[in-house]
Curated annotation (Swiss-Prot):
Catalysis performed (reactions): L-glutamyl-tRNA(Gln) + L-glutamine + ATP + H2O = L-glutaminyl-tRNA(Gln) + L-glutamate + ADP + phosphate + H(+)
Protein's UniProt name: Glutamyl-tRNA(Gln) amidotransferase subunit A
InterPro entries reported in the protein's UniProt record: Amidase (IPR000120), Amidase_CS (IPR020556), Amidase_dom (IPR023631), AS_sf (IPR036928), GatA (IPR004412)
Alphabetical keyword list: ATP-binding, Ligase, Nucleotide-binding, Protein biosynthesis
Organism: Lacticaseibacillus paracasei (strain ATCC 334 / BCRC 17002 / CCUG 31169 / CIP 107868 / KCTC 3260 / NRRL B-441) (Lactobacillus paracasei)
Cellular-component GO terms for this entry: glutamyl-tRNA(Gln) amidotransferase complex
Length: 484
């Protein structure tokens, strides 16, 4: 199956008409992954037997008109638990962890007839911006195999961009869906915090994590979000609010819409060539009848330090459960119980995870709590208020997803602060709990540029409306990555 020339709607029609069966589609997809992934390294594990069994069941039951995902193979980021399929979070400490239940999003996909074909690579415990922190392999950018795919959902993004699957799930804590989507020239959507259940998502930072989508087409993302969104009694952070049809506003014009462009998002540190692509996108929106006005989000500069204190502090707490006792990796030849804890965690966690655990533990300690964690929370409030002030007068905020295009593998891995700053434009959205998407906005030196669209709380529909209008005006998807 040529996923470069196919949307979920087109795939649904082929499956409904009998032009292709789900079993054939799964076989073709698995064969394509086995061929392409030798270079891309997007997958950690394939669910071949489970996918074939599910496909046969879908073929036997038939596909209804209102089941656009039925029979469609989808990849899953490896921090979303899947019953019977090893789930590692790309960490040695969970190398052989076989979950006994499915995450809520997996249950919803299964009920919709979608097929999990495999688990994708990521930065260990979703901590990273390049997928170089995986304990198992380094995923390559679909456009240039010497460059990173972004992170932490780099495997999911590369798999979609390389044409291995039509769609994938990822998670976004500080940009982990949008940044790899931008680096690989695809659509990445982070829903509003609380829109999608986190039950079954291996926790990194509980107040920031959110499951979202990676696809080539805007409507595909909306259809996927239609299935996975909604309140879940097992996750108290999910919002008990109605879930609209996210495809409803796709195709509507954007005439009269008021769009904000923060001056901080085109300032120091942003590649001028990337900034030019965003300015060109703003001009396109104006040509479509919208107004684009420069605004200010003055506390953007404090987002990265605030985020790394909050996220690391929550990670320090969340990762206490990985102790070598209940499940996961356990060190051998230990002398006593303390040795089990110390050696299992020392040998099981990678350097970036240990760095963040130590930072978080320090920030939460009695002598530094007020100076660091409490202060970071206050900055988070200021960043949220910045967005609230802008959204009093505007429908949407736009800007670059990342300051630069994808960087070379190994280029930033020894300089964590430089790596962290790559997420400066995506992190504020997570701190404020807002929905946002990255859509293709052109190329710089042959590498994709992402346009970030930020919406009001629980207004993903406007993001999809504007993203689809922008997509329809451009032919960026006509260019296909070939790797190098």
């Amino acid at each position: 199956m040529d996923y470069f020339k196919t949307s979920i709607d087109q795939l649904h029609e082929q499956l409904r008409s009998g032009k292709v069966t789900s079993s054939q589609l799964v076989d073709e997809t698995l064969a394509g992954i086995n061929q392409l992934d030798a270079e891309v390294d997007a997958f950690l594990a394939l669910n071949a037997d489970g996918a074939k069994e599910k496909a046969a069941a879908v073929d036997a039951a038939g596909i209804a008109d209102d089941q656009p995902l039925a029979g469609v193979p989808i990849a899953i980021k490896d921090n979303i638990v899947t019953k019977g399929v090893v789930t590692t979070a790309a960490s040695k400490i969970l190398a052989n962890f076989n979950p006994i239940y499915d995450a809520t999003v997996i249950q919803k996909l299964d009920a919709a007839g979608a097929i999990n074909v495999g688990k994708t690579n990521m930065d260990e415990f979703a901590m990273g911006s390049s997928t170089e922190n995986s304990a198992f392999k380094t995923t390559k950018n679909a456009w240039d195999h010497t460059r990173v795919p972004g992170g932490s959902s780099g495997g999911s993004a590369a798999a979609v961009a390389a044409g291995e699957v039509i769609a994938a799930l990822g998670s976004d804590t500080g940009g982990s869906i949008r940044q790899p989507a931008a680096f690989n020239g695809i659509v990445g959507v982070k829903p509003t915090y609380g829109r999608v259940s986190r039950w079954g998502l291996i926790a990194f930072s509980s107040s920031l994590d959110q499951i979202g989508t990676l696809t080539r087409h805007v409507k595909d993302a909306a259809q996927l979000l239609n299935v996975i969104a909604g309140h879940d009694e097992r996750d108290s952070t999910t919002a008990d609010t109605p879930v609209p049809d996210f495809t409803a506003k796709i195709g509507q014009d954007i005439k009269g819409m008021k769009i904000a462009l923060p001056k901080e998002y085109l300032g120091k540190g942003v590649d001028p060539a990337v900034a030019d692509k965003i300015k060109a996108a703003a001009k396109q929106f104006e040509d479509m009848g919208a107004t684009v006005t420069e605004v200010s989000l003055p506390h953007t500069q404090y987002a990265v330090p605030s985020y790394y204190i909050i996220a690391s502090s929550e990670a320090s707490s969340n990762l206490q459960r990985f102790d070598g006792i209940r499940y996961g990796f356990r060190a051998k030849d230990v002398k006593n119980i303390e040795d089990v804890y110390v050696r299992s965690r020392s040998e099981g966690f990678g350097p970036e995870v240990k760095r963040r655990i130590m930072l978080g533990t320090f920030s939460l300690s009695a002598g530094f709590y007020d100076a660091y964690f409490k202060k970071a929370g206050q900055v988070r409030t200021l960043i949220t208020r910045d967005f609230e002030d802008v959204f009093k007068d505007y429908d949407l905020i736009i800007g670059p997803t990342t300051p630069t295009v994808a960087f070379k593998i190994g280029e930033k891995v020894t300089d964590p602060v430089t790596m962290y700053m790559n997420d400066i434009l995506t992190i504020p959205v997570n701190l404020a709990g807002l929905p946002a998407a990255s859509v293709p906005a052109g190329f710089v030196d042959g590498m994709p540029v992402g346009l970030q669209l930020i919406g009001k709380h629980f207004d993903e529909s406007t993001i999809f409306q504007v993203a689809a209008a922008f997509e329809a005006q451009n032919d960026y998807l006509a260019q296909i990555p070939g790797g190098k």
